[in-house]
């Protein structure tokens, strides 16, 4: 995503009164550090709450972690760092601990995103704000491809609802580098580089949308029917 695109996204977001926060996610946003830093700065200057989701690969030592985050102090409100056995060889990685130490020194709020292993059926899947500790796996994206075989299968007819996002009154959307505005990853409501955010939101009707309408009526199973 280019700076020009980021500026356009922020301009449109500023015109929508319900958008209060901007988060940079991935992939891994720290791989594009100069653009990430400028994007956070621009969002902060416009009055948005700012956040980043990262795997923390950059926090190899306490000293290095401090330098990576130093320029983000005072413009970054929070950072979420993934730490579990999908990302590292230990549940709470050295990188995550280094990032936490640096964030604390710089006054940046930091929390961990930790996903349980497939065989752990005691972990609840997080809806919206993730709970403390480990969350269960959402079988979407790569998880559906790589991990679904690790658990007992269920009949497709049993998937009769989508419990993870509010499709009628979404509290968040995801915008990809191509401008697609996703209500849930993979379900695009439109392209903001072609149609402004305000117009997309005004025209969106969850019941009549060709995908969300079916999901509301009967979940993923309804799409199959």
Where are these regions (language model features)?
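Accessory C-terminal segments flanking Radical SAM cores
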Residues: 135-225
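Conserved glycine-rich "GG(E/T)P / GGGxP" loop and the immediately following alpha-helix
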Residues: 1-128
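Active-site-proximal segments of metal-dependent phosphoesterases and phosphodiesterases across multiple
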Residues: 129-134
């Amino acid at each position: 995503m280019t700076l020009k695109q980021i500026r356009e996204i922020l301009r449109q977001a500023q015109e929508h009164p319900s958008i209060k926060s901007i988060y940079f996610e991935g992939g891994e946003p720290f791989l594009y550090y100069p653009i990430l830093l400028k994007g956070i700065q621009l969002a902060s200057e416009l009055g948005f709450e700012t956040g980043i989701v990262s795997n923390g690969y950059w926090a190899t030592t306490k000293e290095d972690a401090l330098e990576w985050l130093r320029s983000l102090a005072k413009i970054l409100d929070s950072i979420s760092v993934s730490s579990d056995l999908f990302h590292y060889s230990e549940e709470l990685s050295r990188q995550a601990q280094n990032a936490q130490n640096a964030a604390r020194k710089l006054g940046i709020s930091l929390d961990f995103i930790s996903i349980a292993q497939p065989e752990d059926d005691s972990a609840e899947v997080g809806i919206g704000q993730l709970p403390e500790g480990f969350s269960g796996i959402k079988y979407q994206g790569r998880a559906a491809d790589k991990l679904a075989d690790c658990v007992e299968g269920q009949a497709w007819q049993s998937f009769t609802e989508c419990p993870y996002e509010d499709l009628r009154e979404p509290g968040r959307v995801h915008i990809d580098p191509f401008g697609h505005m996703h209500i849930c990853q993979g379900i695009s409501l439109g392209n903001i580089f072609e149609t402004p955010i305000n117009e997309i939101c005004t025209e969106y009707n969850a019941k009549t949308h060709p995908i969300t309408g079916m999901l509301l009526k009967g979940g993923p199973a309804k799409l199959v029917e």
